Amino acid sequence: MSQEYLDFELPIAELEAKIESLRSVCAQDGKIDLEDEINRLQHKSQELTKKTFANLDAWQVSRMARHPNRPYTLDYIEHIFTEFDELAGDRAFADDKAIVGGIARLDGRPVMVIGHQKGRVTKEKVKRNFGMPAPEGYRKALRLMEMAERFKMPIITFIDTPGAYPGIGAEERGQAEAIARNLREMSQLSVPIICTVIGEGGSGGALAIGVGDKVNMLQYSTYSVISPEGCASILWKSAEKASMAAEVMGLTAQRLKELNLIDGIVDEPLGGAHRDVLKIAHNLKQQILADLAELDSLTTEALLERRYERLMSYGYV
């Protein structure tokens, strides 16, 4: 997969292009030694990357959360779990490809893994409906979660959606009901639930698989009731004010942690999760294992009581 850069990364991209050009020259003529120059440019690129990513604003973080190279749910399943067996369909209407889920092993332990799934090329994007689930997707997720409860398997969810699909067909099939039912049922499941926002956490479409005992976010992910563009269109009648909206919405992991709306922030590799998929998968796996160890120490009654108290603590009176 070729590396893509956002506009604020262009100076980094130019340095990386120079480095690749020098490497190409060396490969074509083995007599030319440009190692020192390549090392100098690599050091310069790394320092520039550190400086750039140390000062990202909320709008830049929002765009990082949507980066076209960013790892998706199936990427994390491949690198964190073993023996993944995908399960399909809601047993009522259809199989929604915007939600993937199934049984897997986490260090040998059976778990149920569920997450939003986007596509990278046009055909796959259409197949996955750009990561926007219809009601049957959320009903599939609930079916798998209820199965996990029956077999006493922890539930691991990965959140990455711009929102639930707002099409007419989805509304006719009960989009709001499907989301509401998931919220209610997840709050009562008797097994540990660990949720992680890996990209976009868009409104009810994210919440429908986001009610958990532990809710974490990757460093450059976002979680909000609406997109910055949508917020700007409502408040200022122009999507061009998206950067301003992002700042006031408090959608970054750091801000949500300050508000005690999430439990932890998983550090990403320098430059974002897509720069080193193995490293971010390792970091996320360690977070999940630590959370699971903590939740395993609780009785079922204590787990449910803690989850209830967590939900009741949200908001202001």
From Swiss-Prot:
EC number from the UniProt entry: 2.1.3.15
GO cellular component: acetyl-CoA carboxylase complex
Localization per record: Cytoplasm
A Pfam family it matches: ACCA
InterPro entries, per the entry: Acetyl_CoA_COase_a_su (IPR001095), ClpP/crotonase-like_dom_sf (IPR029045), COA_CT_C (IPR011763)
An annotated Gene Ontology molecular function: ATP binding
Record has Plastid as a keyword: no
Group of enzyme by EC: transferase
Residue span, CoA carboxyltransferase C-terminal domain: 40-294
Pathway stated in the Swiss-Prot or TrEMBL entry: Lipid metabolism; malonyl-CoA biosynthesis; malonyl-CoA from acetyl-CoA: step 1/1
Any GO BP annotation: fatty acid biosynthetic process
Reaction equation(s) it catalyzes: N(6)-carboxybiotinyl-L-lysyl-[protein] + acetyl-CoA = N(6)-biotinyl-L-lysyl-[protein] + malonyl-CoA
SUPFAM superfamilies: ClpP/crotonase
Function: Component of the acetyl coenzyme A carboxylase (ACC) complex. First, biotin carboxylase catalyzes the carboxylation of biotin on its carrier protein (BCCP) and then the CO(2) group is transferred by the carboxyltransferase to acetyl-CoA to form malonyl-CoA.
UniProt subunit comment: Acetyl-CoA carboxylase is a heterohexamer composed of biotin carboxyl carrier protein (AccB), biotin carboxylase (AccC) and two subunits each of ACCase subunit alpha (AccA) and ACCase subunit beta (AccD).
Family stated for the protein in its record: Belongs to the AccA family.
Name of this protein: Acetyl-coenzyme A carboxylase carboxyl transferase subunit alpha
Phylogenetic lineage: Bacteria, Pseudomonadati, Pseudomonadota, Gammaproteobacteria, Pasteurellales
Originating gene: accA
